[in-house]
């Protein structure tokens, strides 16, 4: 199997290119401490990630408060606290996974167009790309708030293929989460699952991506 006929590679961000869990956890704990709730560990926060910022905050609150229903007012307030806390630590401890830089270089030299499709708020993407010095690899990116729908909806994938003047057949999605694989399936697009990411502590192969890789560097053999 290889994907040398593709023109566009659509990457997920958190759990695929970068490990941002340390900073997401810091921001979540800042929010929880505001409500005099106990801090969570990275391990506890990991399965809450993948659907965007608000679901992350909601899951952390539900986990911490256990019995009470989380009101919309509480969630909105907690989200604001989390959002401003995350702004302060966006790239404090976030790092690229092993092999990402070399592989992006390789794919770039081969002439593939590369973009990012994330369920992270759009405004946080660029500061991280800048800090890690990888912005130049990507033609554009969309976040959870860029369009009216986010992954697992196919809309962001159609949008990116369209923006890059290519077809679904010539595009491929690379991600660690079921949302990435389901979005690709909803768009009738091929997909590559990476096994080292978050994915709610579930096995990515359960969602039937076209192929699964265990490290980012493995992509060099597929393109």
Where are the regions that the model predicts?
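Residue-level detector of anion-binding/catalytic polar loops
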Residues: 38, 113, 190
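Short alpha-helical
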Residues: 23, 52-55, 102, 123-124, ...
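Alpha-helical substrate-recognition element adjacent to the catalytic core
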Residues: 34-65, 72
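Substrate-recognition element of Asp-dependent hydrolases with the DxDx(T/V) motif
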Residues: 16, 100-129
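Generic enzyme active-site microenvironment
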Residues: 10-12, 117, 174
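Asp-based, Mg2+/Mn2+-dependent phosphohydrolase catalytic module
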Residues: 1-6, 122, 127-223
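Metal-dependent phosphoesterase signature
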Residues: 61-102, 110-112
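Active-site neighborhood of HAD-like aspartate-dependent phosphohydrolases
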Residues: 2-47
């Amino acid at each position: 199997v290889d994907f040398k006929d593709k023109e566009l590679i659509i990457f997920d961000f958190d759990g695929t290119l970068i490990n941002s869990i340390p900073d997401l956890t810091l921001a979540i704990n800042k929010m929880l401490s505001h409500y005099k709730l106990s801090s969570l560990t990275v391990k506890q926060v990991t399965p809450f990630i993948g659907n965007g910022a608000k679901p992350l905050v909601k899951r952390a609150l539900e986990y911490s408060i256990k019995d009470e229903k989380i009101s919309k007012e509480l969630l909105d307030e907690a989200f604001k606290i989390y959002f401003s806390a995350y702004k302060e630590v966006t790239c404090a401890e976030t790092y690229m996974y092993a092999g990402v830089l070399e592989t992006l270089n390789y794919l770039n030299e081969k002439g593939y167009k590369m973009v990012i499709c994330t369920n992270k708020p759009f405004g946080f993407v660029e500061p991280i790309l800048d800090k890690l010095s990888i912005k130049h690899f990507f033609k554009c990116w969309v976040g959870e708030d860029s369009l009216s729908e986010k992954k697992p909806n196919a809309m962001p994938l159609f949008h990116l293929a369209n923006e890059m003047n290519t077809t679904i057949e010539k595009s491929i999605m690379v991600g660690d989460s079921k949302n990435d694989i389901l979005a690709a399936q909803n768009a009738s697009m091929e997909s590559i699952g990476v096994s080292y990411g978050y994915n709610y502590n579930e096995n990515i192969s359960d969602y039937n991506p076209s192929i699964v890789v265990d490290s980012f560097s493995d992509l060099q053999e597929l393109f």
